[in-house]
Regions:
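A short, polar/charged loop-to-alpha-helix boundary motif
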Residues: 45-60, 107-122, 285
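Conserved N-terminal catalytic core of the sugar/cofactor nucleotidyltransferase
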Residues: 153-227, 238, 303-304
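A glycine-centered beta-loop-beta connector
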Residues: 19-22, 27-44, 83, 91-109, ...
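A short, conserved acidic/glycine-rich loop-to-beta-strand motif
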Residues: 246-256
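Catalytic-core segments of class I nucleotidyltransferases/pyrophosphorylases
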Residues: 224, 231, 237-244, 257-260, ...
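Bateman (tandem CBS) regulatory domains
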Residues: 1-4, 11, 57-67, 140-143, ...
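The conserved cystathionine-beta-synthase
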Residues: 5-23, 30, 49, 69-88, ...
Length: 357
């Protein structure tokens, strides 16, 4: 059974917890008799976060009150065909009393690409592991930054394990500085349940240039790209379906970052004061270094040339193609400095939050 049900009076935070515990991406909102009132999807929650809803808000404020659903009697193949046509990941199955029997996921009948009822939308993943990690020296004098250990496991091994868990088995790792340490450890990836191919950067190619060295003929569907210094518990399948359902060319995962201004801020128009806001907080969505990219965009990246992800974003926007942001509520950190490395190690040793695989 895929059914996860909550009350309309439960909070958004409760819905997030229910999704994370169940490894699902859709919860049914029901009354006391189990009659469907609406649904809350992983995407609904993330769109609410973009709109600055508080996590203590009742789910009745963000739920879809007219959801797509199935009546009993359809085959699994028929339901999957309908979901795919409508670019929907999942839908509840109702009985004649409008009570929820189950939730059908588009990946439920596919072998080899499912995890907990989910199907990966990604044809491949690329781990960008070619950086030097200069700010972490001397720790990186003879070791690439992604091979640094946090909680007894290297950063990049955590990524490989997470990708495998989410059904993403086709992995490319871009390497340059001390790249042999990575290839010697993972080899072909078979001992980790994945297939790994290495992309050698002979020179610095920026944050996206190495993608031009990957043949898009070796996989189908969009690619997942993740920086090699990121530790996260993001649900890659939720990210993939968010990208798919929004029909985007490129999707950017982003973390909420709050800046507290320690002073009263004067609001003005020219020399005229309009008011004072005492010690305001500003919220920003910051790039998490995780992307979903349609495979045809790879051919638009200059071959073996320096090219940053910001350049790719600008190109897609210039071509008037769609880019969406995927706000994360999962654990995330990037290991860019010694202080960040030490903080992550302390978090894992204290088991702060649900950060272990």
């Amino acid at each position: 059974m895929n059914t996860v049900t909550i009350s309309p009076y439960d909070s958004v935070f409760f819905a997030i917890s229910a999704l994370e515990k169940s490894l699902k991406t859709l919860v049914s909102v029901v009354d006391k008799d189990g009659v469907l009132l609406g649904v809350v999807s992983d995407g609904d929650i993330r769109r609410a976060l973009i709109a600055h809803f508080d996590v203590n808000t009742s789910v009745s404020e963000i739920m879809n009150t007219s959801p797509f659903y199935f009546s009993q009697g359809l085959t699994r193949a028929e339901m999957r065909k309908i979901l795919k046509k409508n670019r929907i990941e999942a839908a509840p199955i109702l009985d004649d009393k409008h009570q929820v029997i189950d939730i059908f996921y588009i990946g439920d009948i596919e072998d080899g690409k499912e995890r907990g009822g989910q199907r990966s939308q990604f044809g491949a993943a690329v781990i960008m592991a070619g950086g030097e990690g200069r700010r972490l020296r001397p720790l990186t004098d003879e070791l690439p930054k992604p091979m640094l250990k946090v909680g007894g496991i290297s950063i990049i091994e955590r990524q490989v394990r997470s990708l495998a868990k989410h059904g993403i088995k086709n992995i490319f790792i871009t390497i340059n500085y001390c790249g042999d340490k990575i290839s010697e450890y993972f080899k072909d990836g078979s001992s980790f349940g994945v297939s790994i191919k290495y992309v050698q950067e002979e020179k610095k190619l920026g944050t996206a240039g190495a993608l031009s060295l990957i043949s898009s003929k070796t996989f189908e569907g969009p690619i997942l790209v993740i920086n090699g210094d990121v530790i996260t518990t993001i649900d890659f399948n939720s990210f993939g379906y968010f990208h798919f359902s929004n029909n985007a060319k490129l999707s950017i995962a982003a973390m909420k970052y709050i800046v507290d201004v320690p002073y009263g801020v004067v609001q003005n128009h020219n020399e005229n004061v309009l008011g004072i806001v005492e010690k305001p907080s500003k919220q920003y969505l910051c790039n998490a270094g995780i992307y979903a990219i349609e495979k045809d965009l790879i051919t638009s990246i200059p071959h073996n040339a320096f090219f940053n992800m910001t350049d790719l974003v600008q190109k897609v926007l210039s071509d008037k193609q769609k880019i969406v942001v995927f706000p994360m509520f999962e654990y995330w950190t990037d290991i860019g400095s010694k202080s960040e490395l030490e903080k992550a190690r302390q978090q894992f040793s204290l088991n702060i939050g649900d950060i272990h695989e």
